[in-house]
């Protein structure tokens, strides 16, 4: 899928400026100067340019991207490969551009090489970052798993094409609050147990510190510009998925381990972000009471900056792939979560 007027060209053009000079991003990236590498879903790059067209420089054979000009999606790039994709036929003048990674492909690394102006135009300096920042931590519900499918029955190809982190409830909530955001979501993983007991040697926390998810031992280097006022954690749907034969867990041992690990994770987030960041722990379905207990324990231990929010399922149709939340559901959740975040002592 590409826009009318879009023109993919093999091979990457080299922009005149480094990526960090011409593009604003809040996502986790490894800055290599002329390019940046990234893995997490929902990572976005925002720029400004003058002229009638723009080239988007990408090297990614695994993920899909939306290209938005002046707030409108003008192209969806499906596993574009090593290319400069041109958007042309625009009115002559100043424009904004946004490139966003739609889906999760944790086994692959993506490369963004910036923007190239069409003849007679120019790439302008990057937009200013927003004052507000929110991090969303979670699983498939956080990253928009199959949310634009319109059906629960999806094959793997349909799942890849219909996952859109840019309309996940986290992205929509952040836009309502005019906040930059990170969608640090990984499908299928939990706090201590993954869906159906798969991959028992790893959990979400195995990968959380990374920039590049497929690189063992990789650690994200915060450039100093990421200081979220709010971190929203929604992990537990996979932990409490039905136990399978042969697993060592019992319901009681799983619940106890989950609560312990969740409390440890909140303490780690507090150390990472400092006392001023509010931590919001989301209760959903089978994990709700356990999360509430963890929040209560953190409050009793003196951390009043940890808050509980219950994700109400009323009005949700779960028409995403495999019964996940749909784009409709993501809008409903965002319309409920944004007012809650406004009610917290952030000054928002």
Regions found by a protein language model. Name each.
Residues 79, 186, 311-313:
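Active-site donor-binding loop signature of nucleotide-sugar glycosyltransferases
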Residues 1-137, 141-162, 348:
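N-terminal secretory targeting modules
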């Amino acid at each position: 899928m590409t826009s009318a007027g879009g023109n993919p060209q093999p091979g990457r053009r080299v922009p005149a400026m480094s990526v960090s000079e011409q593009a604003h991003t809040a996502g986790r990236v490894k800055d290599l100067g002329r390019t940046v590498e990234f893995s997490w879903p929902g990572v976005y790059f925002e720029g400004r340019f003058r002229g009638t067209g723009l080239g988007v420089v990408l090297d990614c054979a695994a993920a899909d991207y939306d290209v938005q000009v002046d707030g409108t999606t003008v192209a969806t790039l499906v596993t574009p490969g090593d290319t400069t994709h041109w958007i042309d036929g625009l009115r002559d003048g100043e424009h904004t551009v946004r490139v966003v990674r739609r889906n999760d492909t944790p086994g692959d690394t993506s490369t963004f090489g910036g923007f190239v102006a069409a003849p007679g135009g120019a790439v302008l300096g990057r937009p200013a970052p927003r004052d507000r920042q929110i991090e969303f931590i979670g699983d498939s519900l956080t990253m928009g798993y199959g949310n634009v499918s319109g059906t629960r029955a999806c094959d793997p190809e349909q799942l890849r094409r219909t996952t859109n982190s840019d309309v996940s409830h986290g992205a929509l909530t952040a836009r309502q609050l005019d906040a930059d955001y990170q969608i640090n979501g990984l499908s299928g993983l939990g706090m201590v147990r993954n869906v159906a007991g798969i991959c028992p040697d790893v959990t979400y926390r195995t990968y959380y510190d990374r920039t590049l998810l497929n690189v063992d031992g990789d650690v994200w280097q915060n450039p100093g510009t990421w200081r979220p006022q709010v971190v929203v954690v929604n992990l537990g749907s996979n932990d409490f998925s039905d136990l399978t034969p042969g697993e060592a867990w019992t319901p009681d041992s799983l619940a106890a381990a989950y609560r312990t690990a969740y409390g440890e994770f909140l303490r780690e987030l507090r150390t990472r972000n400092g006392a001023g960041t509010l931590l919001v722990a989301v209760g959903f379905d089978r994990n709700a009471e356990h999360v509430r207990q963890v929040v209560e324990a953190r409050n009793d231990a003196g951390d009043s900056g940890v808050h509980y929010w219950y994700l109400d399922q009323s009005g949700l149709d779960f028409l995403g792939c495999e019964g996940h939340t749909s784009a409709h559901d993501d809008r409903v959740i965002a319309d409920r979560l944004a007012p809650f975040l406004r009610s917290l002592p952030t000054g928002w």
